[in-house]
Amino acid sequence: MAAVFHYGTDSLTVSDAMAIAGGACKGVISTDTAAVVKRSESAVESIVSSGKTVYGINTGFGILASTAISASDTATLQHKILQSHSVGVGQPLPVEVAKLMLITKAHSLAKGHSGIRLSTLERIVWHIDQEAIPVVPEKGSVGASGDLSPLSHLFLPLIGMGELWVPASNKQGYQRVAAMDYLKAQNIQPLSLGPKEGLALINGTQFILSFAVKAVQRLHNCLEAADIIGAMSLEALTGTKAPFDARLHALRPFAGNQLVAQRLRLLLQNSAIMNSHVDCDRVQDPYSLRCMPQVHGASRNSWLHLSELTQIELNAVTDNPVLLENGEAISGGNFHGQPLAIPLDYACVAAAELGNISDRRCYLLLEGKWGLPVLLMKDVGLNSGFMIPQYTTAALVTENKTLCFPASADSIPTSLGQEDHVSMGSISGRKLNQVIDNLEYILAIELLSAAQAIEFRRPLKSSVILEFAHSYIRDYVSFASEDRIFALDIEQVVSQLRSFQFVKQVGQFAKESGVSLNQGFEQFEL
């Protein structure tokens, strides 16, 4: 990954966007980008001076599109649209999501099809560099005509309104300040928006897109973790790796299935635990063990679909109207969020099912079968063992099921019927990340349970990779010989999942051991 990203000309990826948001990469405006932005700025000036009626430049918005606006009022119109459309409610977005909105919007505007002035684009990039991130309410977008309300809040600070998150004076987190106060402290004047700029700023899918970017990264991490954790559960339950045979999966060649089967084979190779029961009389394992390639693999296929479409949207122009290279303005529907809303809802089901099958493995670990003690503790009765953590997975799995209703299947007409079909993709994006929040906890509880269960297979050891995974978690959570506050253990483990460190460290160890878990399936890499 390059240390510098050129807005408008480089191809933006999920990793790039997250790197810019995290400060590992700097986004800049190149001379080529400046030229195309100035070209579209000139096109707007020509339209205004010609007196030609073009939506959003010298007309009202939505149902008011037929209302002409005089040339003297076009600038006022742009300020009014930011104020009138700032109607969001609810909690503020996480700072990282709001920052991603700025980054993805800057990249889209930098393509030179929106008619925005170079000075306005530069101010947006200044906010990113300064980490002066607008306060944006989480609710209020219907996902067409773009994410109007959240984007309006996002750009209020450009005109000296709204609020900002800025780095706290003690360097710990952010503090919330009035945008105008911050601009004054920086000796920066608010912008006076030109024709079309207000509409260009708030028309787009960057709210939906930013949640998609987060989800692509987070769900990928969960998918990688689920295979490792599932393999640990299989070992603890003395399951067989026979259902992961490559010849079997070649007969039903879904790429996700084949990848998961390969990963499980490699994770389990040369395991003394596995070799100890090769000749046992157990014919088949329960589905939650045997069908990991089919279930985890289906979720991977869904992730791949979302990842591919997110990549397209990251480099798309979702404004309306758009300005072509010849200065022609075309009014269309690139702002409609449906292309992301549907795959986000699809991924919601995929993430929920990953949690569903994980909960089933948690339950298997507690049953006291195949040589494991009931509830994974020897002195139960006095102790409840790992009984109650599975209550939490059951609750989270059920909550995820309620979040799987596809928001994109619903639509409520807005703007007096002019905008008569909307995507609700903003809800799809938010609830997918809620499902992933729950999924991370479910996987953390399975990892706790599997790590506990493997201890009862000693002195036999698992594969070198799974033993590393086990010892890694043991650095944070010890074996439980009696009851304790397991919520503290869960938080320790989930922090390792959410920081991506568990997957990163296990993957790095595998590579150092000469094992490439995803070889041949590079399309599933982030």
Residue ranges and their predicted role:
Residues 1-2, 143:
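Residue-level detector of intrinsically disordered, flexible termini
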Residues 52, 67, 260:
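Polyanion/phosphate-binding surface patch
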Residues 110-129, 133, 144-148, 156, ...:
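Well-ordered mid-protein domain cores that form the structural environment of catalytic cofactors
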Residues 2-51, 78-137, 216, 234:
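Glycine-rich, flexible loop motifs
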Residues 48, 52-54, 132-138, 152, ...:
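A residue-level detector for conformationally permissive "hinge/kink" positions
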Residues 55-77, 84-107, 137-159, 191-208, ...:
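FAD-binding core of FAD-dependent oxidoreductases
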Residues 2-25, 30-33, 40-48, 74, ...:
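C-terminal auxiliary extensions adjacent to catalytic cores
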Residues 38, 65, 148, 416-419:
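Short, solvent-exposed polar/charged micro-motifs at secondary-structure junctions
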